[in-house]
Regions:
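Glycine-enriched alpha-helix->loop->beta-strand junction motifs that scaffold or abut catalytic
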Residues: 110-114, 177
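General beta-strand structural signal in soluble alpha/beta enzymes
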Residues: 90-93, 114-117, 142-145, 170-173, ...
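Cytosolic ligand/metal-binding cores
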Residues: 148
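Rossmann-fold NAD(P)-binding glycine/threonine-rich loop
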Residues: 97-109, 119-144, 152-158
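Short, hinge-like loop/turn segments at secondary-structure boundaries
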Residues: 58-62, 132-135, 160-162
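NAD(P)-dependent dehydrogenase/reductase Rossmann-like domain
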Residues: 2-16, 20-29, 36-39, 151-173, ...
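A short helix-to-beta-strand connector/capping loop
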Residues: 87, 138-142, 166
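N-terminal glycine-/serine-/threonine-rich beta1-alpha1-beta2 phosphate-ribose binding loop
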Residues: 2-110
Length: 352
């Protein structure tokens, strides 16, 4: 079958930016029956890219891009997408690049749909969010399910509630799979630093755990949810309490990892105080009806919903005008490349 006719069988053309852990998992999903309507026309990591159909079809594409392929050129990738005969054209951003996120609005304005796991725009400065909303007026769509809860149905549920005239009043929960794992497992029987090293070795934290411990990733997720609920919150309006002591914030990663024991005494003290009151420690995000937002470590009673989480579970408790007696709770695994990639695929398929 001629290449042109073969391509016409596909409903959705995709360019994938980022072939790391999440992007690699997304590539694997493209080889499943669920992705039969998708046509990958370009893929790139931070340095190299591939747009040749035969190369893109190879199952070891991610590994090949580590050493082969043309130099990264987004103009070439977009040209490949524009040249496709597919009715729906999608850019998938599986990176954490702030620079790439800043281009989402530009791509939307050009008529491309964008599906992303990148929180830098939706959870960044407020002007960027407003630029994004303005770009959506052109008719292109923005799939961001993977930015919160590794694809748990948080944003989709919130949007449906708003479409039905409901409104978010308060929000509380555990929004980080890594911090959930750490405090679900921290019982004072061994140092926090030992648990942190274990979590890092298992891939539950970033290579530099300060990315998790700072609370900034949780703050981005809180902003994304709040903004989708109608709260025009700026980054500086979220109170973020970092778990990283001031002396450890500016040093390089190697030195930080060598000094993890400096986290032990402060957290052991907080744990002992909480235990004496019958409470446990959890790293919570909270938003109230007045738009006051806070992210940080708090004590909660043993019967609190967040005290009964397991592993890397995330939990989102939404109180709305209609769910006001008891909150609507969404809970499940909040970390992992496979579930995040599945959320990306789900958003792409919803565009077809």
């Amino acid at each position: 079958m001629p290449a042109a006719k073969r391509e016409q069988a596909f409903a959705i053309a995709v360019v994938l930016l980022g072939t790391g852990v999440v992007g690699g998992a997304f590539l694997k999903l493209l080889n499943t029956p669920a992705a039969a309507s998708l046509h990958l026309v370009g893929a790139a990591n931070s340095r190299r890219q591939q747009t040749e159909p035969a190369k893109l079809a190879e199952r070891n594409l991610r590994e090949q891009l580590k050493s082969t392929g043309a130099q990264r050129d987004d103009a070439v990738l977009l040209a490949a997408l524009a040249a496709s005969d597919a009715a729906t054209k999608v850019i998938v951003d599986a990176t954490a690049s702030t620079a790439l996120a800043a281009r989402h609005a530009e791509w939307l304005a050009q008529g491309y749909h964008v599906v992303t796991a990148n929180k830098s725009l939706g959870g960044g400065e407020l002007p960027g969010w407003r630029t994004l909303q303005a770009a959506l007026a052109n008719g292109a769509r923005y799939g961001d399910s993977a930015t919160v809860g590794a694809g748990l149905p948080v944003l989709s549920t919130l949007r449906r509630l708003r479409q039905c005239g409901d409104a978010l009043l308060t929000l509380e929960g555990v929004f980080s799979g890594s911090l959930s794992y750490l405090f679900n497992g921290y019982d004072g029987s061994r140092p926090f630093s030992a648990l942190l090293r274990e979590a890092r070795e298992r891939g539950y934290t970033e290579p530099d755990p300060r990315a998790d411990l700072s609370g900034e990733d949780v703050a981005r997720k809180l902003l994304i949810i709040a903004r989708n609920a109608g709260f025009a919150l700026g980054w500086d309006e979220v109170q973020v309490e970092s778990l990283v002591p001031e002396p450890l914030r500016a040093i390089d990663t190697g030195e930080f990892l060598a000094r993890l024991e400096e986290l032990d005494e402060p957290l052991a003290t907080l744990h002992a105080e909480a235990k004496a009151r019958g409470n446990v420690l959890r790293f919570l995000a909270r938003l109230n009806q007045r738009g006051h937002a806070r992210v940080g470590l708090v004590e909660v009673p043993a019967e609190h919903p967040a005290a009964r989480l397991y592993g890397t579970d995330n939990q989102f408790a939404l109180t709305t005008t209609r769910y006001h007696t008891q909150p609507l709770v969404i809970q499940g695994p909040g970390a992992g490349p496979e579930v995040t990639a599945q959320a990306l695929l789900g958003d792409v398929l919803a565009l077809g």
